[in-house]
Design a protein with these regions (language model features):
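Membrane-proximal transmembrane or re-entrant/amphipathic helices at the cytosolic face
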Residues: 291-292, 316-381
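Interfacial transmembrane-helix starts/ends
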Residues: 78, 114, 135, 143, ...
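Single conserved hydrophobic/aromatic residue that forms the stacking wall/gate
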Residues: 1-23
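Interfacial/gating helices of multi-pass transporter permease domains
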Residues: 34, 80, 102-122, 191-199, ...
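Interfacial segments at transmembrane-helix termini and the short loops linking adjacent helices
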Residues: 174-208, 259, 325-330
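Helix-loop junctions and terminal segments of transmembrane helices
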Residues: 129-147, 218-219
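Interhelical loop/hinge segments that connect adjacent transmembrane helices in multipass membrane
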Residues: 34-38, 53-91, 285-303, 361-363
Length: 381
């Protein structure tokens, strides 16, 4: 009898490797902390891989390398993999291009872009990737079974969850950009000026969060049907838009004498992400796989109203950067947690007052219950 390993095994291995990385970052008396961190990242990945091997072997799934290049299945996977890699990496290519452009700007521009991108990628990694991980296998199974009705239901569920989470998160990231950066990064070589410059780019990045999360949900709708060319085509369009907008915005801001032209790079990234998501959504609508019916539009309207209520609270109670700078680290942490906690309560409270119930996003497909549990586990870890 094959024994199934715990479904949370990858999460525990990831947590174990993350602990190792964190411990290495605070290694005492290190003359070269950069080298220590680089080695720690490598060892953390090795630990994670080693942790998974016994569980793979326990249910006869331990990989044995065999180069079956002539196998039809391998050829099909390679044919799908190459365009999928490029299409799904559009945002990473955009970030790499923006980093290249930032290298020609004032000193510190690369760091400002990097720090703000890290804060943007956190909710994407926590919510967007977790949602994509849960949705993809379900869509693949339903596509293989030619069950279009449940395929639509799963996709609709993923889109609604992505919007319910990403819209308020983007607005919160915009309003709380200063407090977040001050709490996490301020101190040492990271000066008040760096705080202001990083805040500008994070504010421009924030609305790209919606596009990034939607891309992570919409792309599996194509990959699950073995259509890798459509996301590739739209990804290339998004990369082209990012390149053109980045150069246009940066050159315009430099010509105008603005002291923070790197904000143009972040703004171009957000625009490209939204364009990519919009193209994917339009294609799915044309294929009658996504329906913008009254219930969907009604849900979006309530999300917007609840987000506005949350924004009013944050704008009213958030303080200027100078106050955050003068506060101690403990006070910053508790103040930030208070603002985030209350804003979450206000957001979902207003949603429920407007008649929202979780049954509206109850999945109607044959998705297994453990996939929902895995979504929660991925988010928690």
């Amino acid at each position: 009898m094959i024994r199934r390993p715990p479904r949370s095994t990858p999460l525990y291995s990831s947590a174990a490797s993350d602990v190792y990385k964190r411990q290495s970052m605070i290694a005492p008396n290190s003359n070269n902390p950069g080298r220590v961190l680089a080695i720690a990242v490598f060892l953390a990945g090795l630990i994670q891989l080693t942790f998974l091997m016994p569980f793979l072997k326990s249910f006869n799934r331990f990989p044995t390398p065999r180069w079956g290049w002539n196998d039809q299945g391998v050829k099909r996977i390679i044919k799908l993999m190459i365009p999928s890699m490029i299409g799904s990496s559009a945002s990473q290519f955009n970030l790499l291009f923006n980093t290249l452009i930032a290298s020609f700007l004032s000193a510190g521009s690369i760091s400002w872009i990097y720090y703000s991108d890290r804060l943007l990628e956190f909710p994407v990694g926590v919510f967007g990737v977790a949602l994509s991980t849960v949705v993809l296998p379900t869509l693949s199974r339903e596509s293989a079974n030619q069950d279009i009705s449940t395929f639509k239901s799963t996709l609709d569920w993923g889109i609604k969850i992505a919007l319910i989470i990403s819209v308020p998160s983007a607005v919160g990231l915009f309003i709380l950009s200063g407090p977040l950066i001050a709490t996490i990064f301020l101190g040492g070589n990271f000066t008040n000026y760096d705080l202001d410059m990083t805040q500008y780019s994070l504010m421009a990045y924030s609305f790209g969060l919606i596009g990034l999360c939607l891309v992570l949900v919409l792309s599996p709708a194509f990959y699950s049907r073995e259509d890798a060319k459509t996301p590739l085509r739209f990804g290339l369009i998004a990369m082209s838009c990012n390149a053109v907008c980045s150069l246009l915005f940066v050159l315009s801001l430099v010509w105008l004498g603005v002291n923070y032209p790197h904000i143009g790079l972040a703004l171009a990234f957000s625009i490209a992400s939204i364009i990519n998501a919009s193209l994917l959504a339009r294609e799915l609508i044309n294929q009658n796989l996504v329906l913008l019916d009254k219930s969907f539009l009604y849900l979006i309207s309530r999300v917007i109203i609840a987000t506005l209520a949350m924004s009013a609270f944050l704008l009213g109670f958030n303080q200027e950067n100078s106050i955050w700078i003068s506060s101690g680290i403990t006070e910053r942490i508790f103040s930030l947690l208070f603002l985030i906690g209350v804003s979450v309560i206000i957001y979902f409270g207003v949603l429920f007052l407007l008649g929202f119930r979780f049954k509206e996003i109850r999945i109607k497909s044959k998705i297994k219950k453990y996939n929902i549990k895995n979504l929660i586990l991925y988010i928690c870890f």
